[in-house]
């Protein structure tokens, strides 16, 4: 009877569902990162886009790409050609597409850079998690591998910088042969991406900027420095008098930076006590003797983002020390506004050629890279020429 009941239950049970044939699943592919260099360009042009609106105005385009070779008209023509709609807003994606179409032999280079960037970030994350728990031998191996990786990358960077500097020097040479020298005032900004630290300049003991710099001031250069420092003292006196007779300090007014002697203030080795120097009158014959008797003064005004002030201070001190040590730099000083985030940098050079060589030096390029990362607005660069006779003073 029990067996009959069990048989009845088995017959009444609904049939078990038949297994459905499995459809083969294709492995999910990683999202396409886009053409080689596209990710890199996006990061580069994002820093050039100060408004973070995904577009570059011509002013932002000029600030980032001006290299002293292409004229303003040529830059405008390039901007309009990429834009295609004759607007003043160029989408960064269009800019990425434009450069992606012109990569040529650098296509595999940029693709390798993007892969290298991902690999380095992954290795750094793993090192951060595993290094402290690793044995001493494993820690030693990690330090060795990291040090050798840095060495190999620095060797590649040196080769690339050498080629870049050579091409830029040639381009500036061709441009100077075709154009006359004239005073100019323009907005200027860094034109390259990268975050190379200024310490790479200070660690180089064999590099000397400019092929004609000897590193030792001649007697004539010492006289130049003496005259420039005297003029600087005269300017200081005049500014003090203006502040004394004018209204009291107000927000946004100037104050000398730094207020005490420090690495960022370079009065020069030939400063003399103030003796109320006077300027000699201009003589017409001095103007007819050519550009050799003209001094160039470069004024750079910057507005630093609050979160980048500390890094900017360090970079500014390094740059002022580096610039003041150049044999053709007559004087360099920095001024800080009372708002704490605005600065004016003054550089006096013996001639324009020396200043332009300095602009192409590793120290100057490193400082410009710091600027593009930490400024809240494009910096303003103004250059003015002074006849040499204006700087001749006497103490009688």
Curated annotation (Swiss-Prot):
<dbReference type="GO" id="GO:0005794">
    <property type="term" value="C:Golgi apparatus"/>
</dbReference>
<feature type="binding site">
    <location>
        <position position="55"/>
    </location>
    <ligand>
        <name>Ca(2+)</name>
    </ligand>
</feature>
<dbReference type="InterPro" id="IPR011008">
    <property type="entry name" value="Dimeric_a/b-barrel"/>
</dbReference>
<feature type="compositionally biased region" description="Pro residues">
    <location>
        <begin position="14"/>
        <end position="34"/>
    </location>
</feature>
<keyword id="KW-0333">Golgi apparatus</keyword>
<dbReference type="GO" id="GO:0005634">
    <property type="term" value="C:nucleus"/>
</dbReference>
<dbReference type="Pfam" id="PF13202">
    <property type="entry name" value="EF-hand_5"/>
</dbReference>
<dbReference type="InterPro" id="IPR007138">
    <property type="entry name" value="ABM_dom"/>
</dbReference>
<dbReference type="GO" id="GO:0005789">
    <property type="term" value="C:endoplasmic reticulum membrane"/>
</dbReference>
<feature type="domain" description="ABM">
    <location>
        <begin position="296"/>
        <end position="385"/>
    </location>
</feature>
<keyword id="KW-0597">Phosphoprotein</keyword>
<dbReference type="GO" id="GO:0042984">
    <property type="term" value="P:regulation of amyloid precursor protein biosynthetic process"/>
</dbReference>
<dbReference type="InterPro" id="IPR018247">
    <property type="entry name" value="EF_Hand_1_Ca_BS"/>
</dbReference>
<comment type="function">
    <text>Inhibits the interaction of APBA2 with amyloid-beta precursor protein (APP), and hence allows formation of amyloid-beta. May enhance the activity of HIF1A and thus promote glycolysis under normoxic conditions; the function requires its ABM domain and may implicate the stabilization of the interaction between HIF1AN and APBA3.</text>
</comment>
<dbReference type="Pfam" id="PF03992">
    <property type="entry name" value="ABM"/>
</dbReference>
<dbReference type="GO" id="GO:0019538">
    <property type="term" value="P:protein metabolic process"/>
</dbReference>
<dbReference type="InterPro" id="IPR002048">
    <property type="entry name" value="EF_hand_dom"/>
</dbReference>
<keyword id="KW-0106">Calcium</keyword>
<dbReference type="GO" id="GO:0005509">
    <property type="term" value="F:calcium ion binding"/>
</dbReference>
<dbReference type="GO" id="GO:0000137">
    <property type="term" value="C:Golgi cis cisterna"/>
</dbReference>
<feature type="region of interest" description="Required for interaction with APBA3">
    <location>
        <begin position="181"/>
        <end position="190"/>
    </location>
</feature>
<dbReference type="GO" id="GO:0009306">
    <property type="term" value="P:protein secretion"/>
</dbReference>
<dbReference type="InterPro" id="IPR011992">
    <property type="entry name" value="EF-hand-dom_pair"/>
</dbReference>
<feature type="region of interest" description="Disordered">
    <location>
        <begin position="14"/>
        <end position="36"/>
    </location>
</feature>
<feature type="binding site">
    <location>
        <position position="53"/>
    </location>
    <ligand>
        <name>Ca(2+)</name>
    </ligand>
</feature>
<feature type="domain" description="EF-hand">
    <location>
        <begin position="36"/>
        <end position="71"/>
    </location>
</feature>
<feature type="compositionally biased region" description="Polar residues">
    <location>
        <begin position="206"/>
        <end position="217"/>
    </location>
</feature>
<dbReference type="InterPro" id="IPR039862">
    <property type="entry name" value="NECAB1/2/3"/>
</dbReference>
<dbReference type="GO" id="GO:0005737">
    <property type="term" value="C:cytoplasm"/>
</dbReference>
<keyword id="KW-0479">Metal-binding</keyword>
<feature type="region of interest" description="Disordered">
    <location>
        <begin position="197"/>
        <end position="220"/>
    </location>
</feature>
<protein>
    <recommendedName>
        <fullName>N-terminal EF-hand calcium-binding protein 3</fullName>
    </recommendedName>
</protein>
<feature type="binding site">
    <location>
        <position position="51"/>
    </location>
    <ligand>
        <name>Ca(2+)</name>
    </ligand>
</feature>
<comment type="subunit">
    <text>Interacts with the N-terminal domain of APBA2. Interacts with NEK2. Interacts with APBA3; APBA3 seems to mediate the interaction between NECAB3 and HIF1AN.</text>
</comment>
<feature type="binding site">
    <location>
        <position position="60"/>
    </location>
    <ligand>
        <name>Ca(2+)</name>
    </ligand>
</feature>
<feature type="binding site">
    <location>
        <position position="49"/>
    </location>
    <ligand>
        <name>Ca(2+)</name>
    </ligand>
</feature>
<dbReference type="GO" id="GO:0005783">
    <property type="term" value="C:endoplasmic reticulum"/>
</dbReference>
């Amino acid at each position: 009877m029990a067996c009959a009941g069990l048989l009845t239950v088995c017959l009444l049970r609904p049939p078990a569902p038949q297994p459905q044939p499995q459809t083969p699943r294709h492995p999910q592919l990683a999202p396409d990162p886009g053409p080689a260099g596209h990710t890199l360009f996006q990061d580069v042009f994002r820093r050039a886009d100060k408004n973070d609106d995904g577009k570059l105005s011509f002013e932002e385009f000029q600030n980032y790409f001006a290299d002293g070779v292409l004229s303003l008209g040529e830059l405008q023509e390039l901007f309009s050609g990429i834009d295609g709609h004759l607007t003043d807003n160029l989408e960064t994606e269009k800019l990425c597409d434009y450069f992606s179409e012109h990569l040529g032999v650098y296509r595999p280079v940029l693709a390798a850079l993007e892969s290298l960037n991902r690999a380095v970030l992954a290795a750094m994350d793993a090192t951060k998690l595993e290094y402290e728990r690793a044995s001493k031998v494993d820690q030693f191996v990690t330090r060795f591998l990291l040090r050798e990786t840095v060495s190999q990358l620095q060797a590649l960077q040196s080769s690339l910088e050498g080629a870049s500097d050579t091409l830029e020097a040639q381009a500036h040479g061709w441009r100077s042969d075709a154009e006359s020298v004239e005073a100019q005032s323009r907005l200027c900004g860094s034109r390259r991406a990268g975050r190379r630290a200024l310490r790479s300049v200070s660690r180089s003991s064999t590099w000397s900027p400019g092929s004609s710099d000897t590193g030792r001031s001649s007697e004539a250069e010492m006289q130049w420095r003496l005259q420039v420092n005297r003029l600087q003292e005269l300017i200081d006196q005049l500014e003090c008098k203006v502040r004394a007779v004018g209204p009291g300090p107000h927000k946004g007014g100037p104050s000398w930076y730094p207020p005490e002697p420090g690495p960022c203030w370079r009065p020069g080795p030939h400063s003399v006590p103030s003796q109320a120097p006077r300027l000699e009158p201009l003589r017409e014959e001095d103007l007819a003797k050519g550009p050799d008797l003209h001094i160039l003064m470069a004024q750079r005004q910057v507005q630093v983002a609050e979160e980048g002030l500390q890094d900017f201070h360090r970079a500014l001190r390094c740059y002022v020390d580096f610039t003041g040590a150049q044999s053709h730099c007559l004087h360099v000083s920095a001024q800080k506004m009372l708002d704490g985030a605005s600065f004016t940098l003054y550089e006096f050079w013996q001639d324009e050629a020396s200043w332009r060589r300095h602009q192409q030096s590793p120290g100057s390029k490193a400082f410009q890279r710091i600027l593009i990362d930490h400024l809240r607005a494009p910096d303003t660069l103004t250059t003015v020429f002074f006849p040499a006779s204006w700087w001749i003073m006497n103490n009688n």
